[in-house]
Amino acid sequence: MTPTLLSAFWTYTLITAMTPGPNNILALSSATTHGFHQSTRVLAGMSLGFLIVMLLCAGISFSLAVIDPAAVHLLSWAGAAYIVWLAWKIATSPTKEDGLQTKPISFWASFALQFVNVKIILYGVTALSTFVLPQTQALSWIVGVSVLLAMIGTFGNVCWALAGHLFQRLFRQYGRQLNIVLALLLIYCAVRIFY
């Protein structure tokens, strides 16, 4: 990979990992509401699911020259529905101001999000088909880059969770407003899938 292509790869992956999306918003919300320690199950579920999805993206990118548009369209609708459900859960979740104690979303729920998270699927397919496959079809490289993509994504999730933890006091003071803003951002993510 040339230095120019490598630079473009890092720029694409880091910007994509650090911009708002379902995972980052969920990580921020969970750490704000429950603290970083209580959110580690959420982050672990995201990380494992992210890795598996990146490996699946590698298989898809490697095996298929063109992805079936009907399958992508169906996946987009499933992803949008799940993201809207997450938005509803965040918008209606009790805050510390409400005096109710809640548990963070489960490991398995955050794990399942990855399989309908269109942002990371497109992230994986785009990175692999744009930066890796034109350079090499070696399976070891494709799998290695898939693992790297999952690590970069996990880094973004942890950064957002740490932001939620560090600004927890401020976010808790305005918990209801924050939940509404985060829910609206998720709705925006769902709409952006189609436009």
Swiss-Prot record:
InterPro entries: LeuE-type. One of its GO terms (molecular function) is amino acid transmembrane transporter activity. This is Cysteine/O-acetylserine efflux protein. GO terms for cellular component: plasma membrane. Keywords: Amino-acid transport, Cell inner membrane, Cell membrane, Membrane, Transmembrane, Transmembrane helix, Transport. Its main location: membrane. Coiled coil: none annotated. Belongs to the Rht family. The chain crosses the membrane at residues 8-28, 47-67, 70-90, 105-125, 142-162, 177-194. GO terms for biological process: cysteine export across plasma membrane. Residues 1-7, 68-69, 126-141, 195 are periplasmic. It comes from Escherichia coli O157:H7.
